[in-house]
Amino acid sequence: MTRKLFTSESVTEGHPDKIADRIADAVLDAIYAKDNQARVACECLVSTGLILVAGQITTDCYVDIPRVARETVREIGYTRAKFGFDCDTCAVITSIDEQSPDIAMGVNEAWEKKQGEARDEVETLGAGDQGMMFGYATSETPEFMPMPIALAHALTRRLAAVRKERILPYLRPDGKSQVTVEYEDGRPVRVDTVVISTQHRPDIDMATLRDEVLETVIKPVIPAEMLDNRTRYFINPTGRFVIGGPQGDTGLTGRKLIVDTYGGMARHGGGALSGKDPTKVDRSAAYAARYVAKNVVAAGLADRCEVQVAYAIGVARPVSISVETFGTGKVSDDRLVELIRAHFDLRPGAIIRDLDLRRPIYKAVSVYGHFGRPDLDLPWERLDKVEALRADAGL
């Protein structure tokens, strides 16, 4: 019997890095609502009293970026100066240029088309950059996500809910969770440690906060059978968390990549997700790789599946596809690659088409994870390839 501990974290929408991600995706959605052929690479920085939105955007429409940024911060809950950040009085600075023509020429006309080798219309669109992207799925939870990150996200969603619904009216927007799960022979058996840090009003008694967070946030979220008398709880372990949000830390887009994906259980290619239109394979191929891995696991071809796909800038066809099933595969990993090539088109244009990615759907996934979202209907979470994979694999 092999036992090990594994830990993942999540952050609330009021965390400074997530404010930045959410603003970047709100800008993308606002543009896509008017021009779904736009090229968007939007980055954001938030600090004390300041929002800076910068990037390369090519579009025929007009979007009031400062207004989008302020409304996003308002939705999060930073509406008063005493919270450390105020959507109405903070400065908003923008620095926007068009997409580099050197990049655009590779996206607009893929290598295959330039060489006269394009097989169809999909190969007119090249990848927006080089790089490798990973997708992952596991059978250990109903949403096919690792349990540590699934529970960590559930805790931060609940933390935001009890604040917004005024169940715990003394909470403020910034917050984090961390969950350590004990595994026995690869299966989760218990929760070992729960960490919650939440911004709060300065006059609240810490003992009261800890008791109420335990009863209204942790216990309703984590299944009772996963908790025992050895489970440890650290709730605001420093003893005070009044200064938070951009006043406490500078936030940047792309700083919470592991929170956005699989909580460290799978590898990561290094590319951020938020603020990018789907011609950027950092985003679209990461979604496609999750789509592939989830369908492989749901089809019973493996209990765990990690898919890597890689691209060259300006080239439509992936330069490589690889699979790792960690010894859980019902068929060989080589056979899985063959099945993936047969049933999934991983060229950027095909990913955008098949997952219907030219829509304003991105702000919703900018917080609480891009994958395994039972609260959202996401195209990359569909299980529409299961039967075909099973049939082709002979299961």
Curated annotation (Swiss-Prot):
GO terms for cellular component: cytoplasm. It comes from the Bacteria. HAMAP family: S_AdoMet_synth1. L-methionine binds at residues 99, 249, 280. This is S-adenosylmethionine synthase. Gene3D superfamilies: 3.30.300.10. The lineage of its organism: Bacteria, Bacillati, Bacillota, Clostridia, Moorellales. Coiled coil: none annotated. ATP binds at residues 15, 174-176, 240-241, 249, 255-256, 272, 276. Keywords: ATP-binding, Cytoplasm, Magnesium, Metal-binding, Nucleotide-binding, One-carbon metabolism, Potassium, Transferase. It comes from Moorella thermoacetica (strain ATCC 39073 / JCM 9320). Catalyzes the formation of S-adenosylmethionine (AdoMet) from methionine and ATP. The overall synthetic reaction is composed of two sequential steps, AdoMet formation and the subsequent tripolyphosphate hydrolysis which occurs prior to release of AdoMet from the enzyme. The keyword Transferase applies. Its EC number is 2.5.1.6. SUPFAM superfamilies: S-adenosylmethionine synthetase (SSF55973). Residues 99-109 are annotated as: Flexible loop. Binds 2 divalent ions per subunit. Pathway: Amino-acid biosynthesis; S-adenosyl-L-methionine biosynthesis; S-adenosyl-L-methionine from L-methionine: step 1/1. It catalyses: L-methionine + ATP + H2O = S-adenosyl-L-methionine + phosphate + diphosphate.
